[in-house]
């Protein structure tokens, strides 16, 4: 699998991670604009696009996250096209999360106090033709500048890509996760327990259209859709289950 590391000159965390990635001899493709405002035409062809990025939140909680980009609704105020999602590689996303967690728990990094989690689909770019992921340091200016956080991300990238390129990972079921909050606690936990390879994630508050449901099942390899039964509204559960049943898509409560 060939891959492209992408950084943005507008993003301090991205610049921090880029520096560490380059220290290990890797090339990084640099954008003048925000990564979220990029699109397919900005990049050379690659089998995997990996965005080195900041994560921002009002809580300013120290967090290291992984997610695939995409807009689940008509709102594209953070880049990309309305109701469009980029392809997803659940093996990359899950191994990356597990490796971040592994390094984060090491003695030399433990005291940084970072949480590790997935995020649901949100923001651009949405028109990529091959899988992509954002790997992020959050959630404030203070954390974006931490060298050890960038080192955790860099070491995790190297381990993840080596595992994939050498096929040194176990065969497990691949899933799409629906329901729960923005940081997808249920599916983060399943991934860290090494139960499944978790790919696309969507939150409780998103009302998924048939268009998005069709993209979820066509742009990612998966064995079944996992539904966070307590993490969805009743009417949405009924709608999604009906769609999956009508299309012979395997689903399970999780």
From Swiss-Prot:
Its EC number is 3.1.1.96. GO terms for biological process: D-amino acid catabolic process. Binds 2 Zn(2+) ions per subunit. SUPFAM superfamilies: AF0625-like. It holds the Pfam family tRNA_deacylase. Residues 61-83 are annotated as: Disordered. Keywords: Hydrolase, Metal-binding, Zinc. The keyword Cell membrane does not apply. One of its GO terms (molecular function) is D-aminoacyl-tRNA deacylase activity. It comes from the Archaea. Monomer. Belongs to the DtdA deacylase family. This is D-aminoacyl-tRNA deacylase. It comes from Methanococcus maripaludis (strain C7 / ATCC BAA-1331). The gene is dtdA.
């Amino acid at each position: 699998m060939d891959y492209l590391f992408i950084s943005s000159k507008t993003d301090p965390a991205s610049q921090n991670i880029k520096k560490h990635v380059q220290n290990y001899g890797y090339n990084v493709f640099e954008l003048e604009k925000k990564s979220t405002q990029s699109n397919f035409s900005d990049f050379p062809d690659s089998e995997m696009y990996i965005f080195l990025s900041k994560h921002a939140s009002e809580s300013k909680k120290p967090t290291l996250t992984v997610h695939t980009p995409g807009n689940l609704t008509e709102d594209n105020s953070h880049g990309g096209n309305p109701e469009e999602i980029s392809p997803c590689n659940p093996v990359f996303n899950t191994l990356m999360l597990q490796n971040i967690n592994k390094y984060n728990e090491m003695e030399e990094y433990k005291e940084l106090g970072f949480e590790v989690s997935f995020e649901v689909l949100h923001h651009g770019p949405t028109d990529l033709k091959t899988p992509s992921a954002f790997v992020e340091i959050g959630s404030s200016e203070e954390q974006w500048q931490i060298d050890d956080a960038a080192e955790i991300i860099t070491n995790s990238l190297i381990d993840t890509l080596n595992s994939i390129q050498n096929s040194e990972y176990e065969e497990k079921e691949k899933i799409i996760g629906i329901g729960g909050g923005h940081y997808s606690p249920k599916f983060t936990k399943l991934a860290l327990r090494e139960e499944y390879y978790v790919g696309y994630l969507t939150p409780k508050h998103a009302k998924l259209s048939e268009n998005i449901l069709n993209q979820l099942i066509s742009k990612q390899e998966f064995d079944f859709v996992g539904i966070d039964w307590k993490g969805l509204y009743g009417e949405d559960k009924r709608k999604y289950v009906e769609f999956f049943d009508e299309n012979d898509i395997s689903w399970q409560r999780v």
